């Protein structure tokens, strides 16, 4: 393990009916701004529970924080918060509402333009916030991260401030979520884990097993949730998986990647794609592109999560990546750029942005603009089937990977065939 300091001060309040705890969690003398997204909280009962819990308190409401929160909307909330001397924020919604509220908490005490904070990447001076989570996905309810967009300039950047003081998670509020939103949340959770797991081998047996436990849980519950999204037990597992995937617990002392996320952010900024959907497209492409470098960890992942134990290493790597893509597809998500109507112009613009910023992601800081181009090229539609039933493994490798990785894998396969 690498050296680390772990700190997560968020109080987690979990279970049915726990929104009523709000009155005990927010000091009575606070001037509260409650932030919301659209109107779904008024149809699923969440709004009524929140208002009832805060009866008699001094609060104001701010509505309209959109998916991928936009700086123009957040500036309006910041201005309102300053005018009303707000000193406590309550985010009621999913990751976008919580992310946006984190910037609001930093923007209210800040004298300048809040976009400056986003470009800087962090803020230390904030007012406290709590959350009522309605959509499992981002883990924002128990971390200090956020992602903020500027639609005017097609930009989207990560931003770090303070952890929520508390977060309330009631699985029953997820029962009315649309299937697509659930699918994107499952994909987001899965890739959050993989960004911290799919790096180097033997850094920490414990962190690997914690990560694998979340992955195995997601693989188990995803098809069941598709059949019954109003099962309290299943949605509880989903909610806690999403929280545990990005609250720092599985990142202690290990390398992290995040290249997939940074590429995905650009797809959202340019095309408005839902975050989880971008990850379902980009992550298999990342694995295909970096299969040689990540080979040992992919083999471990394939064996422990998908039960891939037969065949030479190159075959197992290929099958593991195929199973990963199949998982996303079975959620009902697209897994190729072409399916989303994204072509070479977008790829070149993402590469340009990476190069302009001098971006370098991945556990070794080697995913540059050029590597991002290769990853995105590997996210295009397959020209031929990679179904292994009745198809030679040579064809699987030839149709699944790009030149440098493909050559290595074919050499491995030919050696094992005695050619």
Regions flagged by a language model, labelled:
Residues 390-419:
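Acidic/polar low-complexity segments and flexible, solvent-exposed patches
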């Amino acid at each position: 393990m690498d050296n680390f300091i772990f700190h997560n001060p968020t109080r987690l309040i979990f279970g049915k009916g726990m929104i009523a705890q709000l009155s005990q969690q927010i000091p009575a003398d606070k001037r509260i701004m409650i932030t919301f997204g659209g109107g779904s909280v008024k149809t699923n009962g969440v709004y009524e529970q929140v208002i009832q819990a805060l009866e008699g308190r001094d609060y104001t409401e701010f509505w309209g924080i959109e998916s991928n929160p936009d700086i123009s909307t957040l500036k309006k909330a910041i201005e309102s918060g300053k005018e009303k001397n707000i000193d406590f924020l309550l985010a009621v919604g999913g990751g976008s509402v919580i992310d946006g509220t984190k910037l609001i908490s930093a923007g209210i005490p800040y004298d300048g333009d809040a976009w400056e904070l986003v470009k800087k990447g962090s803020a230390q001076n904030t007012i406290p916030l709590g959350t009522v989570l309605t959509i499992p996905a981002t883990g924002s309810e128990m971390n200090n991260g956020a992602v903020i967009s500027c639609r005017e300039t097609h930009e989207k950047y990560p931003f770090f401030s303070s952890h929520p003081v508390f977060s309330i998670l009631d699985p029953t509020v997820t029962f009315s979520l649309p299937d697509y939103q659930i699918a994107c949340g499952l994909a987001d959770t899965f890739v959050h884990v993989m960004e911290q797991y799919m790096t180097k081998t033997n850094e920490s047996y414990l962190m690997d097993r914690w990560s694998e436990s979340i992955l195995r849980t997601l693989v188990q519950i995803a098809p069941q949730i598709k059949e019954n999204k109003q099962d309290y037990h299943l949605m509880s597992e989903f909610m806690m998986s999403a929280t545990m995937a990005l609250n720092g617990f599985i990142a202690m002392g290990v390398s992290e990647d995040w290249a997939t996320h940074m590429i995905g952010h650009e797809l959202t900024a340019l095309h408005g794609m839902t975050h989880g959907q971008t990850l379902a497209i980009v992550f298999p492409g990342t694995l295909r592109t970096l299969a040689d470098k990540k080979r040992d960890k992919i083999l471990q992942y394939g064996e422990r999560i998908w039960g891939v134990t037969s065949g030479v290493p190159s075959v197992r790597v290929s099958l593991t990546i195929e199973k990963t893509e199949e998982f996303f597809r079975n959620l009902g998500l697209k897994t190729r750029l072409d399916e989303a109507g994204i072509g070479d112009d977008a790829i070149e613009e993402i590469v340009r942005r990476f190069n302009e910023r001098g971006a370098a992601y991945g556990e070794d800081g080697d995913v540059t603009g050029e590597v991002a181009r290769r990853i995105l090229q590997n996210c295009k539609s397959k020209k031929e089937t990679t179904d292994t039933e009745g198809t030679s493994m040579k064809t699987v490798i030839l149709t699944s990977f790009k030149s440098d990785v493909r050559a290595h894998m074919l050499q491995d396969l030919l050696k094992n065939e005695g050619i």
